[in-house]
Swiss-Prot record:
Transmembrane segments: none annotated. PANTHER family: GERANYLGERANYL TRANSFERASE TYPE BETA SUBUNIT, GERANYLGERANYL TRANSFERASE TYPE-2 SUBUNIT BETA. Catalyzes the transfer of a geranylgeranyl moiety from geranylgeranyl diphosphate to both cysteines of Rab proteins with the C-terminal sequence -XXCC, -XCXC and -CCXX, such as RAB1A, RAB3A, RAB5A and RAB7A. Its EC number is 2.5.1.60. It catalyses: geranylgeranyl diphosphate + L-cysteinyl-[protein] = S-geranylgeranyl-L-cysteinyl-[protein] + diphosphate. Pfam families: Prenyltrans. PFTB repeats lie at residues 20-61, 68-109, 116-157, 164-205, 212-253, 260-302. This is Geranylgeranyl transferase type-2 subunit beta. It comes from Bos taurus (Bovine). The modification N-acetylglycine is found at G2.
Length: 331
C-alpha cells in the first residue's frame, strides 16, 4: 500500500484571477516603514530582498514606482574593499548578495555604480582547486555559489576570469543517479540545487551533459494533486518551487511535461486578496520572496500580463537582451 502524499487542499473560494495591481501596491509599500518588525528582521538578507522586489515590479511593468537613487546609493555603500557586496551596510560580503546587487544594477543599467574589477577579483578569490566556490571567506561550499559566481561574471561580461573548466567538473560531480543535483557530491537531489546547476550549465554551454529526460521525470514528479510543486519527495508544495522546478524544466526543454493549468490554479490560490502578495501556500502570510517567484512562475506559464522572464537569471528577458547575455536552453 502506498504512502499518502503530503499536500494541501485548495478551498473553493481561493483566488482564481491574477490580482496584479494589488501585488504592485504590496511591493511598492513594503519597507516604507523602516521600523516595522518584519523589515528590521530581514536586514540580514536586505540586498536579495531588494532584488526580489525590483525584479517582480519590473516583470509587472511597475519598476518606475521604486526609489532608484536610494537603491543605487545603498548598493554602493555595501561594496567592501575586497570587492564583494554584503546584504546590508556593515554586514560581511557574500556571493549571494554580490549576485543580487549585480542583477539590480543590470536592471537599472547602472553597473558602474560599483567597482566591477573588484567584484571580479572577489569572485575569483572564492574558487577552490576542485573548481567549486565558497560563498564567502568562511568557506561553505555549495553548488548555489557556483551558479552565483558564473551568473555574476556573465552579467559583467567577465566569465573568462575564472577556471570555467574546473567549475564545470565540480558541478557535474554533484549529479546524481536520478538525474538531479545536490549541493555537493553525494548530496540529495533538490529542486533548488537543480535550478542552480542547470542554470550554471546553461551559462557555460554544457547542457548537453544533462540527461534531460531523466531529470525532467524527477522534476515532474514534484507536482502534487493540488497542482503545486515541492522541492523533493514527501514535502509540501510551495510557490517558490513554481520557479525552481518550472525554470529547470524550461532550461532542459521539458516544461510541457507538467499540468500547467493545475499549477497555475495553485499559484493563484496563494495570493492574498486583501493585501496583495503571494504566500508559500494558500492562506499563509505573504512576503516579497514568494511574490517574485509566484509572478515569475506565471510568466513561464505564459501569463500575458507579465513580461517574459529568463529561466536562468530570473530577470526580464528584455534586460538580458540589452546586455547581450543569452544562455543556451534545450529546445
Amino acid at each position: 500500500m502506498g504512502t499518502p502524499q503530503k499536500d494541501v487542499i485548495i478551498k473553493s473560494d481561493a483566488p482564481d484571477t491574477l490580482l496584479l495591481e494589488k501585488h504592485a501596491d504590496y511591493i511598492a509599500s513594503y519597507g516604507s516603514k523602516k521600523d516595522d518588525y518584519e523589515y528590521c528582521m530581514s536586514e540580514y538578507l536586505r540586498m536579495s530582498g531588494i532584488y526580489w522586489g525590483l525584479t517582480v515590479m519590473d516583470l509587472m511593468g511597475q519598476l518606475h514606482r521604486m526609489n532608484r537613487e536610494e537603491i543605487l546609493t545603498f548598493i554602493k555603500s555595501c561594496q567592501h574593499e575586497c570587492g564583494g557586496i554584503s546584504a546590508s551596510i556593515g554586514h560581511d560580503p557574500h556571493l549571494l548578495y554580490t549576485l543580487s546587487a549585480v542583477q539590480i544594477l543590470t536592471l537599472y543599467d547602472s553597473i558602474n555604480v560599483i567597482d566591477i574589477n573588484k567584484v571580479v577579483e572577489y569572485v575569483q578569490s572564492l574558487q577552490k582547486e576542485d573548481g567549486s566556490f565558497a560563498g564567502d571567506i568562511w568557506g561553505e561550499i555549495d553548488t548555489r555559489f557556483s551558479f552565483c559566481a558564473v551568473a555574476t561574471l556573465a552579467l559583467l561580461g567577465k566569465l573568462d576570469a575564472i577556471n570555467v573548466e574546473k567549475a564545470i567538473e565540480f558541478v557535474l560531480s554533484c549529479m546524481n543517479f536520478d538525474g538531479g543535483f545536490g549541493c555537493r557530491p553525494g548530496s540529495e537531489s533538490h529542486a533548488g540545487q537543480i535550478y542552480c546547476c542547470t542554470g550554471f550549465l546553461a551559462i557555460t554551454s554544457q547542457l548537453h551533459q544533462v540527461n534531460s529526460d531523466l531529470l525532467g521525470w524527477w522534476l515532474c514528479e514534484r507536482q502534487l494533486p493540488s497542482g503545486g510543486l515541492n522541492g523533493r519527495p514527501e514535502k509540501l508544495p510551495d510557490v517558490c518551487y513554481s520557479w525552481w522546478v518550472l525554470a529547470s524544466l524550461k532550461i532542459i526543454g521539458r516544461l510541457h511535461w507538467i499540468d500547467r493549468e493545475k499549477l497555475r490554479s495553485f499559484i493563484l490560490a496563494c495570493q492574498d486578496e486583501e493585501t496583495g502578495g503571494f504566500a508559500d501556500r494558500p492562506g499563509d502570510m505573504v512576503d516579497p520572496f514568494h511574490t517574485l517567484f509566484g509572478i515569475a512562475g506565471l510568466s513561464l506559464l505564459g501569463e500575458e500580463q507579465i513580461k517574459p522572464v529568463s529561466p536562468v537569471f530570473c530577470m526580464p528577458e528584455e534586460v538580458l537582451r540589452r546586455v547581450n547575455v543569452q544562455p543556451e536552453l534545450v529546445s
